[in-house]
Amino acid sequence: MASQFMKNLKEEVTCPVCLNLMVKPVSADCGHTFCQGCITLYFESIKCDKKVFICPVCRISYQFSNLRPNRNVANIVERLKMFKPSPEEEQKVFNCARHGKKLQLFCRKDMMAICWLCERSQEHRGHKTALIEEVAQEYKEQLQVVLQRLMADKKKFENWKDDLQKDRTYWENQIQKDVQNVRSEFKRMRDIMDSEEKKELQKLRQEKEDILNNLAESESEHAQQSKLLEDFISDVEHQLQCSDIEILQVRLQDVPGSESQKAWKPLPFLSAAVVFLVMTVSSS
């Protein structure tokens, strides 16, 4: 509160020409007060009638010689100088490189800060100017609009980030579920395949056992039939060594359908002629 009061009071005793605390303040007939040096330099720069002067604030004409010292303002300025401003309140002062005066105006055409002497020079005469504070305030308002837009964009980006994080979490969980489902499905299929494999292997083992048993029986029968065949061959060879009378006598003694003939079975790989011959000899 006190800081705002001091600021307002300082504005009341600030020269409208140099925008600094007034030095040797003088007041015109219109009531506006200026630094004696600033208003004198301004009066000389505009090269007007030496008797008539136009106030740079309200543009009212008055006699330059009617300027009078303002002791009240001077006393206030002296008291303000006793108060040391805080670092936050202190601002760096920028002066005109050409005239050494404070840069308190802004030329809108040339887009540059100027002093009040620059405004009256040939370079900037007739250009639209405004106080730096006013232009700065305009820029601050524009920057505020930009800042609001940027903050809105920032909010959108934060929401976007949240959405991305939600999507990441969703897809991580979804893919994890899919991985579990795939593993479960393939395990089920492997269990089925393992069961089928066991069944098929059991069938093959049983088939092998049956085949081997059949082969064993065939081998046993083969051995028996081979023995009988060898016996028949031996008998035939023996009969061939006998005389005709003995051969006929042996034949008469053999009765068809004897046990030896019933026991012998022709093997499937013997030709029909051999089987016929063996049977004939056996029955002779």
Curated annotation (Swiss-Prot):
Pfam families, per database record: zf-B_box (PF00643), zf-C3HC4_4 (PF15227)
- Which GO cellular component terms, listed alphabetically, does the Swiss-Prot or TrEMBL entry include? cytoplasm
Summarize tissue expression.
Expressed in embryonic CNS, liver, kidney, olfactory epithelium.
Where does this polypeptide localize? Cytoplasm
Zinc finger motifs (B box-type), residue ranges: 91-132
**SUPFAM superfamilies membership:** B-box zinc-binding domain (SSF57845), RING/U-box (SSF57850)
CDD domains attached here? Bbox2_TRIM5-like (cd19761)
Could you say which residue ranges form the zinc fingers (RING-type)? 15-59
Q: Which residues form a coiled coil?
A: 130-234
Indicate the principal place this protein occupies in or around the cell.
cytoplasm
Q: Name one GO molecular function term.
A: zinc ion binding
SMART domains the UniProt entry points to: BBOX (SM00336), RING (SM00184)
* Sorted UniProt keywords: Coiled coil, Cytoplasm, Metal-binding, Zinc, Zinc-finger
Annotated Zn(2+) binding lies at C96, H99, C118, H124
Q: Output the InterPro entries linked to this UniProt entry.
A: TRIM/RBCC, Znf_B-box, Znf_RING, Znf_RING/FYVE/PHD, Znf_RING_CS
Stated family: Belongs to the TRIM/RBCC family.
Report what the protein is called: Tripartite motif-containing protein 12A
Origin organism of this chain? Answer: Mus musculus (Mouse)
This protein's encoding gene: Trim12a
